[in-house]
């Protein structure tokens, strides 16, 4: 068959790595004239500022944003790839313009079966029927590629990813495309949720090559797994000036067989650049609160005062940065304008998000992000990790400002998680809910036409709902202009201020919501991935325990502890390691398949936090001991005792060669999309040092944060968790222990949690637990020395560092003590 081979030889519009060597002037030129990789702090590309390495928006694998194709951005900001610092003076010597030439290449079918039949991952199982001879990630695929001297086609996606489904249907279910793949490649499919270690490395590689990453990720690898080209979504046919997948496949096969030296040189350059940058060698510096304030100021510089959030579009919540701004707002001089600005950024963003279509106005819970600056039209998938972190934001907002709207949103998030995303019997939080039911819809389950609303509501309820949620004949969706994304035009309180009766408005809203939700429940429901991921479940445990304490929701606390017990029983293998997966969905029939997914730094760090939070929730020493055990295992498996900081994945066993890009060691710093592994680990160790008294925990945490201090301010919005960890390091921990039971203890506990502070922890304990062995070692040194106040039914002990104040029996006295400790 005759195919067109695309020649990319245009003027690059920026790059991700300064030392890439291209594939020659006749085609797929990446950068022939790079002048070396630099650490120039002045030219730093944030994810939403990254540009294509290989030319304009039509370049291979670099989808541009068309008015009706915002989805083609494919999550680059969500990935958060501020990974590469560039040289100012890098320029291309390639000729401008584009060229096309043709060559005859024959393809023929290759016998073989799809090897995903026994996969446990929901994403991989969804591809079992495809004619492409997919392999799961593993040694067998690489062995075959090297034995047959074939390049590897790597597809990385997720079960919740709309454009992954589109590419599956358009291309990987097409017999002609499958024939080309099976003839010329060894095909490997990876679930990014199941293997974040694999995804992170190839995202960095493709971002280096094209300036963008996202899902689906489509990468072309040497047989040993080093990437020589890649992109994101590739259409089946040529579209928007981009070649179709058949052209790309045949071009990549030709490159491997006819211009192999150039492909190998490019692959080597990409891998070297990734490993150099991901280790952050030479990024150390001084630690101070000035650095925290610089990170906060960088986030504030992007704050949108009109619509909330940061930047323009697409908009992501950036939960860690929101908490950092709240910390600044509550702990800095209230007279300074930046303190007021931080408070404004936090509160306005939470207000606008909860009013927008990015929030499910009927069932609660947040979609992944908004494609517009107003938070109206989202990408409709709902992720566990987004909702646990946003739940914490709203709980912290209620703590600090006693805002009933923040409390209501937090309760609604819990309601959605409880009803849709949990295994109520055994414990555990499910991973995600898909955006769509079918490939031809875009959020149709969540959106409404005016006629659909009229079929459910009538009279005053219809009139109210249409006005309140902006339901009209002209909707919001590009694929169906009649479809409306429900979002709040003006709040009930704003309407009441104009003279309406607030209680009547609330009654109308609640009645309309209940009827619309009941009608929506009759629609086909988007797929829920019931995989239980260790790190995400640990994040959920922490969020639930905070919520339970602040909002006094005992059932939420009990479910969190049930989940944590399951995590420790099923993900901890008894040999000192955590698995990345607690359990796969029952329909996978995977049995012990979770053992095949190795735990990452995130899994360990979030689990340490969850265990500490569980101890504070009830004083069960088993959770404290688990925190110590998991923390010690985390240090043993991931800590770089020579250069400092933590790797995201454990080193290969002695004598084993890591597969593909897993040979590149990474030290995660940026929040993308969850809080980054290194600051999360450092924060966990600081909390544990305050309980255990083990100084090495603090030393490792300080060393870890110091490794990035010279570079982290450039990460701005993506460094929120680092700022919070550094704040925790530099401020003495404040521990509030409420001793007793009944109403008096409840009042003291409510006072203790009344304001968010990153360095404050609160626990309530029975008097008989204040004995040697009943509390952690460091607390024994302080709490057991304090005399019980005579005749008091309950009292509070406030300890800062290693010093405790005398027992406090009244709420007013406790509040004053906390103000002094803050």
Task: Annotate each predicted stretch with a short phrase.
Residues 352-359, 562-573:
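Glycine-rich, acidic and aromatic/proline-enriched surface loops and short helix-turn segments
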Residues 331-340, 551-552, 617-622, 693-695:
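Short coil/turn connectors between adjacent alpha-helices in alpha-solenoid helical repeat scaffolds
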Residues 419-422, 569, 574-605, 610-775:
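Long, polar/charge-rich, low-hydrophobicity segments
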Residues 16, 20-103:
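Polybasic, low-complexity intrinsically disordered segments
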Residues 2-12, 65:
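Extreme N-terminal basic, low-complexity initiation segments
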Residues 326, 330, 395, 399, ...:
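Tandem alpha-helical RNA-recognition repeat domains
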Residues 99-543, 547-550, 588, 656, ...:
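Replace the tail clause
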């Amino acid at each position: 068959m005759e195919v067109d081979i695309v020649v990319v030889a245009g003027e690059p519009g920026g790059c991700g790595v300064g030392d890439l060597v291209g594939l020659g002037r006749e085609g797929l030129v990446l950068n022939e004239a790079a002048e070396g990789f630099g650490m120039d702090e002045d030219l730093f590309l944030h994810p939403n500022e990254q540009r294509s390495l290989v030319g304009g928006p039509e370049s291979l694998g670099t989808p541009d944003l068309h008015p009706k194709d915002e989805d083609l951005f494919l999550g680059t900001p969500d990935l958060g790839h501020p990974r590469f610092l560039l040289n100012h003076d890098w320029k291309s010597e390639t000729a401008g313009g584009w060229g096309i030439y043709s060559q005859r290449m024959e393809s023929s079918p290759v016998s073989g079966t799809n090897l995903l039949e026994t996969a446990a991952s929901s994403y991989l199982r969804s591809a079992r029927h495809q004619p492409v001879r997919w392999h799961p990630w593993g040694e067998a695929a690489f062995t075959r590629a090297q034995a047959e001297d074939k390049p590897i086609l790597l597809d990385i996606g997720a079960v919740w990813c709309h454009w992954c489904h589109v590419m599956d249907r358009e291309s990987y279910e097409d017999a002609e495309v499958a024939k080309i793949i099976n003839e010329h490649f060894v095909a490997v499919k990876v679930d990014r949720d199941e293997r974040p270690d694999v995804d992170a490395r190839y995202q960095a590689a493709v971002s280096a090559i094209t300036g963008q990453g996202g899902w689906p990720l489509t990468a072309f690898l040497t047989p040993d797994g080093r990437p020589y080209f890649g992109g994101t979504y590739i259409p089946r046919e040529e579209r928007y000036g981009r070649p179709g997948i058949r052209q790309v496949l045949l071009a990549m096969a030709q490159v491997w067989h006819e211009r192999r030296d150039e492909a190998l040189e490019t692959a080597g350059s990409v891998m070297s650049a990734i490993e150099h940058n991901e280790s952050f060698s030479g990024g150390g510096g001084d630690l101070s609160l000035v650095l925290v304030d610089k990170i906060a100021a960088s986030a504030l510089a992007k704050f949108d005062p009109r619509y909330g959030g940061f930047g323009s579009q697409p908009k992501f919540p950036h939960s860690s940065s929101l908490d950092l701004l709240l910390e600044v707002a509550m702990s800095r001089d209230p007279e300074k304008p930046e303190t007021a600005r931080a408070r404004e950024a936090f509160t306005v963003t939470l207000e606008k998000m909860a009013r927008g279509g990015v929030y499910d106005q009927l069932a609660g819970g947040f979609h992944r992000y908004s494609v517009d600056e107003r938070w109206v039209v989202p990408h409709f998938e709902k992720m566990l990790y987004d909702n646990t972190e946003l739940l914490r934001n709203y709980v912290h907002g209620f703590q600090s400002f006693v805002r009933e709207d923040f409390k209501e949103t937090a309760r609604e998030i819990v309601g959605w998680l409880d009803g849709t995303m949990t295994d109520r019997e055994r414990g555990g939080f499910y991973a995600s809910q898909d955006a769509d039911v079918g490939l031809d819809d875009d959020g149709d389950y969540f959106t409404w036409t005016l006629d659909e609303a009229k079929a459910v509501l009538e009279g005053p309820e219809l009139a109210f709902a249409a006005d309140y949620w902006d339901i009209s004949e002209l909707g919001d969706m590009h694929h169906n202009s009649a479809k409306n994304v429900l979002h709040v035009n003006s709040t009930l309180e704003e309407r009441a201020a104009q003279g309406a009766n607030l209680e009547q408005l609330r009654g109308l809203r609640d009645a309309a919501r209940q009827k619309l939700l009941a009608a929506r429940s009759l629609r086909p429901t988007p797929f829920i991935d019931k995989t239980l991921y260790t790190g995400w479940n640990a994040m959920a445990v922490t969020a639930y325990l905070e919520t339970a304490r602040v909002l006094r929701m005992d059932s939420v606390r009990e479910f969190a502890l049930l989940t944590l017990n399951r995590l420790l029983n099923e993900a901890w293998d008894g040999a000192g390691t955590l698995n990345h997966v607690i359990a796969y969905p029952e329909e996978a029939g995977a049995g012990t398949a979770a053992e095949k997914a190795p735990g990452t730094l995130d899994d360990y760090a979030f689990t340490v936090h969850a265990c500490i939070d569980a101890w504070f929730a009830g004083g069960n020493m088993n959770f404290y001991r688990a925190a110590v055990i998991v923390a010690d295992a985390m240090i043993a498996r991931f800590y770089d005792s020579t250069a400092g900081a933590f790797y995201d994945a454990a080193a290969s066993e002695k004598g084993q060669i890591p597969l593909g890009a897993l040979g590149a060691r990474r030290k995660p710093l940026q929040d993308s999309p969850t809080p980054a592994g290194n600051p999360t680990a450092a924060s966990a160790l600081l909390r544990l040092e305050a309980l255990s008294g083990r100084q090495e925990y603090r030393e490792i945490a300080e060393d870890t944060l110091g490794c990035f201090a010279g570079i982290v301010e450039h990460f701005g919005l993506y460094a929120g968790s680092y700022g919070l960890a550094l704040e925790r390091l530099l401020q003495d921990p404040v521990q509030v222990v409420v001793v007793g039971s009944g109403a008096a203890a409840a009042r003291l506990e409510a006072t203790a949690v009344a304001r968010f502070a990153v360095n404050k922890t609160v626990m309530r304990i029975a008097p008989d637990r204040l004995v040697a062995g009943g509390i952690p070692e460091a607390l024994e040194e302080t709490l057991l020395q304090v005399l019980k106040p005579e005749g008091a039914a309950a009292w509070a002990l406030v300890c800062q560092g290693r010093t405790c104040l005398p027992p406090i029996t009244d709420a007013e006295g406790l509040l004053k003590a906390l103000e002094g400790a803050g």
